[in-house]
Amino acid sequence: MTRYVITILALMFALTSAMAQKTVKITGYVRDADGSPLELVNIRIKNTLNGAMTNEKGFYTITTTPGDSVALIYSCLGFNKAERIIPSLHADMRLNVQMNYTSLELGEVAVTAIRRQTTTMENIQADRIKLLPDPAGGSIESLVVTFAGVSSNNELSSQYSVRGGSYDENIVYVNGIEVFRPLLIRSGQQEGLSFVNPDLTESVNFSAGGFEARYGDKMSSVLDITYKQPKHFEGSASASLLGGSAYVGSSMGKVSQVTGFRYKSGRSLLGTMDTDAEYDPRFMDIQTYWTYKPTNKIEMNFLGNLATNKYHYVPHSRETSFGTTDEITNFTVWFPNSNERDKFQTLFGALTFKYKASEKVELGLQASAFDSKEEERYDIAGEYWLSDGTENSNMSDAGISAMSVGRYMEHARNKLHSNVMNVGTTGTANLLNNKISWGAQVQFERISDHISEWEKRDSAGYSLPQTGTAVSLISNLYSDNRIESTRFSAYVQDAFKFRTKQGLFTLVGGIRGSYWSYNKEFIFSPRVSLGFIPNFDQNLTMRFATGIYYQSPFYKELRLTTQDEAGNDVVTLNNNLKSQRSIHFIIGGDYTFKLMDRNFKLTAELYYKKLDNLIPYTIDNVKVRYYGENCAKGYAAGLDLKFFGEFVPGTDSWISLSLMKAEQTIRETTKAPLPNSPGYNLSVFFQDYFPGYKRVKLNLKGVLSGGLPVTIPHRGYEAGYFRTPAYKRIDLGVSYQLAGGTDAIMDRGFFQYLKNIWIGVDVFNILDIKNTNSYYWITRADNAQFAVPNYLTGRQINARLIVEF
């Protein structure tokens, strides 16, 4: 009997314990007002410590005990708190929540919520470029250069340097496909339009280092662009003194498309330079992006681009004054029968296929092709004199003495044809708190290159250089090379999020491997980053990233200049060239706070990059000339600071400050700074509006950057170097908005179909500062050399009109 009593009591105890331990789950999605998922939203059951956080898809799960009147609190930086009360909770349930921005809209000005950044990848709002005063014609890169760690010393170019790296060390993706630049570009005047069309852009992400393994083999940075998939009809058209653009987006059931056209002519801007010339630059491109979704599980995309850049230049004369106030030097040139005609044409196409195998697994296939035909033709003949004086450069005037008189001629017939094709596969799988990503790609490259260029100078009738026994050209360069090669690459990575008593951790680790058939080199690149949001202060985010980043050579790096028996410089290809390597160490964090009821964020990052197997290079304007051999090592270290927030209520602005030191040792003997190491860089992006009348907007972009090291042409750093003066520039734009539905003129006739009309005026280089980008070198009969500065653009007024519909 006692045995039965004990058994019954044990069963009753177990049943009671099971009932007491019963739990229920609340799951759901948290989205913003636009329907986009919100990551890192904190969900807490009121008056308890029980909580959870949303993942990158905005999904959350929270476990609790059954009860009546359960209250959930949803909080996220930049959004109003939301509270949801469940009157009776006795079973699992789904609860979706929408959160609203904390900022108040002021007319058409609205503050973007400050998102948490647990990796080194930073999000950029693409719509900020719309009213940004930009001499390059409106590019995403013009906004990127205002970020900490990024610098640019040429307003005519969309190229940029990140933490002392080369322009070629930055990788750009559009919809997951790598895009390429022309290779022969030697000046900002020739460069034309950036590949990325801001009108078509939906989102922009940028990392200045320590990026994930899924991004390719570059040493400095990654710019990741995603184009729009419109849900309804939209479009805009703009025109200015620099050119114009237009785009149209639409959605037709299962098909959506966005197509854009751009035209740029910087003739008026180039007219502010020292050279009096007939400038005729014509840059055009058309891009289209189509999406087809036959089912909820299948998506197909096509991206196409055609770009044609033509640059025609007929110089007449040039007059440049330089030096100190007490000692002015004048350089005057006449150009008889000189001209330059360049043409760059690129074609790009990419097709992607995505298949959602399940709720947690997505697979993809992609194929792309890039074709570029580049042609550079010029014959520039000049008669010059270099003189000292304070009035003008006329040699017949008193007080003027000729320091050097002579003639020169520059000749080039350069052609390059490059073709790059690749096919690849990608995949992602979400398993519990892990997001596993993988991919593999094979890339075929075919490049043919023909170079024929030379330069001849004479002073007082003597050809230079003077050797005493022979007369030769000051420089010449010839090549006729072809290369066909194949690259293989693959990666796998895992993003793992977990919570402890200390806070939320985000760990991303992966490895990337590549092989290039041309130099028969394997490279392996492990990368890892860790983000942490502490429980004691969720306004604080800390992160650490490290990894080994290789940069496999492309065609430009392979060029090795040697001399033949006749003394001519000949370009050969170095198939023993190996990948450059950079080991990154980055530690940093963000702190978000409110000041005067406005949102602010302070970001700081310390970094150190150990560089070896470097291929040294020199820069002339934007043309990069590599040594063609792995003969250097070095380092880059610095501090990047960025202060972001509502400097003016209802607007986003920021100030970026970068301090750095970057050096290289060439052939174990020559120490020199890296070519793109300014030492310091201060950038400002500022937005404002007219007090009491918010339809008048002001956008300001300012840059103060240290000078870059310059070497004597064809000599390299072994012959010494000096730095250009600091780069200083402020561009200002003022715009007036006619808004649909609120302006009387917009309710009449044709205007009622428009959303907005913007009328604006830009003042480029408002302080009219003469910035030096490169130097023209004058050699006297005694082989003494003078460096004459090539100044960039002066002050220029630009008028703009933007129509949105």
Q: Where do the model's predicted regions map?
A:
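Transmembrane beta-barrel wall of Gram-negative outer-membrane proteins
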Residues: 236, 240-263, 276-316, 340-369
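Face-selective signature of the C-terminal outer-membrane beta-barrel domain
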Residues: 293-308, 339-519, 603-606, 654
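Gram-negative outer-membrane beta-barrel transporters
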Residues: 497-503, 607-610, 627-712, 802
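C-terminal beta-signal and adjacent terminal beta-strands/loops
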Residues: 653, 704-711, 736-805
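Surface-exposed extracellular loop regions of Gram-negative outer-membrane beta-barrel proteins
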Residues: 535-585, 606-626, 701-715, 770-774
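Membrane-embedded beta-barrel scaffold of Gram-negative outer-membrane proteins
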Residues: 364-368, 576-630, 635, 759-762
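Short, acidic, small-residue-rich periplasmic hinge/interaction motif at the N-terminus
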Residues: 29-34, 41-46, 71, 75-80, ...
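Periplasmic N-terminal accessory/gating domains of Gram-negative outer-membrane beta-barrel systems
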Residues: 80, 93, 116-170, 176-211, ...
